[in-house]
Amino acid sequence: MILSRVSSAIEMNVCLEEKLEKIGVSANKNPLTVCFVCTGNTCRSPMAEAVLNQLGHVPEFCTACPPELLDRRGIIACSAGIAALEGMPISQNAVAALEKNGIRVTPNNNYPAHTAHQISESDLLTCDLIVGISASHTMALMTAFPQYASKITCLAENIPDPFGGTLEDYEACLEKIRHAVGLMFYGDENA
């Protein structure tokens, strides 16, 4: 059943709007909180977090968002891992790829200081949306936290793990993340 839910979400590219409606996100709650989840929380999910934190707002042209959310609140992203070693630093190649590709370090987006965090029930309680970086992460989340299935979704594209790869591998991964995050939150792969 869980695998079929994950497959359906990927095949039908379930809209963020539908997810928000299902979990009852209120237009009065600021900001929309999104948690990206990968395996170790040192490469893909912190890069997705940094990308969305740089975008950081719900634009008026967002095709995936309910009208009552448009330009009325920001988005704050965080990240976690399904098998994270608490406190491990972000991969230096992830930092280098983000910097090289114009993701700014700001007080609200201080990704070089990121340390790995193991996903917990409190994350699912406090975040509006939990986004698996791949179908396998989404399936693991739904298995571990079935009571929060309505908050859990997946990027439309599985993002390969660059762990241990070259800077070029991380840059290719970042490009896929930007594309997937842009499509999910802004209806535009070039957001």
What are these regions (language model features)?
Residues 2-191:
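Short polar/charged helix/loop
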